[in-house]
Regions:
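Acidic/histidine-rich helix-loop elements
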Residues: 160-176, 246-255, 324-332
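Structural recognition of alpha->loop->beta junctions
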Residues: 190, 231-253, 374-387
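Metallo-beta-lactamase
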Residues: 101-109
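N-terminal Sec-pathway targeting helices
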Residues: 1-19
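Active-site neighborhoods of metal-dependent hydrolases
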Residues: 191-193, 252-377, 473-477
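Divalent-metal coordination cores built from histidine and acidic residues
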Residues: 94, 99, 116-225, 239-243, ...
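Acidic, glycine-enriched loop/beta-strand segments at the rims
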Residues: 38-42, 56-69, 366, 384-389, ...
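Histidine-rich, glycine-flanked metal-binding segment
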Residues: 29-48, 56, 60-100
């Protein structure tokens, strides 16, 4: 008995030590993102400005409002006019640059708070996180309460999948009753949206849709192969993810434009449905196959170290081996990417609402930087600059009611804004590295944004990231 008590004491002592080490690790990691915290005495806490000498690209119409003034009051666009007279306000001279709505990335996977800075430095002032974990609820709370400077943050709950789709990243549902319980739980805990994933059969899928409607939660859907593709055109499902899913499911990898057209037509008739192509993440498969040293590239230094050590490495090895076993795989991947571009073109021509999403945070798809690659792909698919910019602004904001305050420069809207040196309606690349970012009216200059980049580069938070993921597994599984 004494030996048992002694063993129990040792076990509890070890557990206590491990918990203490974990808490210290997370505490130390929090210092790395201290620059995101809002100090009420710091200039970045100010969220009221009068912007002068600025050319406004409102994005509610294809135009430029030349030489305007824009009054931001407590994080809201209060007034846009030729002349505004306000006393006691800080004036920001835009020097005849261009003011656009902040960009919205509608498909991301956030792994730490350093990534929030990477999004801001690239002009992304709102994100839709599509793999919810407890840490995302804490980020969301801090954003809402104004504790940190961050993109406006929306998140789904954990990915809902069927029983046979095994993996620690999936929440496997075994019955309609369990599906309803999870939706109710996600709503109560503060998740914004529901994400359905691969492997949901009809009964469970129906249960999720029914309960989501009752709970007033929009659904974002990575199509399930257990139901017809057209099944995802349900009014409760506000966006469908990935152009590649059209290839994999209804087309069964047959890259046939005639067969594609009927699928495009069915999507276009579903006026409540937005489509998020995520061209970049699939193209990055091709990039991995073409560059054997991609994991050592300068850009990957911005990737979360846990993801770089696990998912990035795993994906690279998968496609490296596929190329080695069958060299023609490279050509097939490139051909499918080109077909994805055709899908984007056809979706646009059919009047489908396209929303910009990158799938950043997995593989080698970088947070923040990747949105400019995604937008360039849409341009190459045949969209005009205005139509491209719509995908990351007004189209995104109309997809979910909870995002309606974003996406355009209008009086009463949230002051998530970019100041860029050139007109993006003529030069799309002008959106890269904006000179100034306003997020809920708070101003970040280029020097501050570059500092956020540097803090994220080569960060040493692998253990802290692993602990947060462990928390997710304990809480959600």
């Amino acid at each position: 008995m004494k030996i048992l008590k002694r063993l129990l004491k040792i076990v509890f002592a070890l557990i206590g030590v491990l918990v203490l080490i974990g808490l210290i690790t997370l505490w130390v990691d929090s210092f790395g993102t201290k620059s995101l915290k809002i100090d009420k005495n710091d200039p970045t806490s100010n969220n009221s400005y009068l912007i002068t000498n600025v050319n406004v690209i409102p994005m509610n119409q294809d135009t430029v409002l030349a030489d305007k003034m824009v009054y931001l009051k407590e994080g809201i666009i209060e007034k846009i006019a030729d002349t505004i007279e306000i006393s006691g306000i800080q004036i920001f001279d835009a020097e005849n640059k261009y003011l656009t709505p902040g960009l919205i990335d509608m498909h991301v996977h956030v792994w730490d708070r350093y990534e929030l800075g990477l999004y801001l430095s690239n002009g992304v002032t709102a994100v839709r996180n599509l793999w919810g974990m407890p840490m995302h609820l804490r980020i969301k709370e801090d954003v809402i309460e104004g504790n940190i400077i961050s993109p406006t943050f929306f998140t789904t709950g954990p990915k809902l999948t069927g029983t046979e789709f095994i993996g620690d990243d999936n929440l496997n549902l075994s019955s309609p009753e369990e599906a309803k319980e999870k939706v109710i739980s996600f709503k109560e805990r503060g998740y914004d949206l529901i994400k359905t994933y691969y492997g949901l059969d009809k009964e469970i899928f129906d249960a999720v849709v029914v309960q989501a409607k009752i709970s007033e939660m929009d659904i974002v859907s990575h199509p399930s192969q257990k139901v017809p593709f057209s099944y995802h055109l349900n009014p409760q499902i506000k966006s469908i993810e990935h152009a590649e899913e059209i290839v994999q499911q209804p087309l069964h990898f047959d890259l046939d434009t005639i067969k594609l057209q009927s699928i495009i037509d069915s999507i276009s008739q579903s006026k409540h449905t937005s489509y998020c192509p995520t061209i970049t993440v699939f193209n990055n498969i091709y990039q991995m196959m073409m560059n054997d040293s991609i994991l050592d590239s300068e850009s990957l230094k911005y990737m979360n170290p846990l993801i770089k050590k696990t998912d990035s490495k795993k994906q690279f090895e998968r496609w490296f081996n596929a190329k080695r076993e069958d060299p023609e795989t490279v050509g097939r991947i490139k051909k499918q990417h080109d077909f994805h571009m055709t899908i984007v073109k056809k979706l646009h021509e059919a009047g489908v609402t396209i929303i910009c999403g990158t799938d950043a945070g997995i593989g080698v798809t970088l947070p923040g930087f990747s949105i400019h690659t995604e937008l360039a792909f849409y341009k190459n698919a045949g969209l005009s600059n205005y139509e491209v910019l719509k995908t990351a602004t007004v189209n995104a904001s109309k997809t979910h009611t909870l995002m309606n305050q974003l996406g355009t420069i209008e009086e009463g809207k949230t002051a998530n804004l970019l100041i860029v040196d050139r007109n993006p309606l003529t030069t799309l690349s002008a959106l890269k590295a904006p000179s100034t970012v306003f997020v809920k009216g708070r101003k970040l200059d280029r020097e501050t944004l570059e500092h956020l980049n540097e803090k994220a580069k080569n960060r040493k938070n692998l253990m802290a990231s692993a602990l947060r993921y462990l928390e997710h597994l304990i809480v959600e599984r």
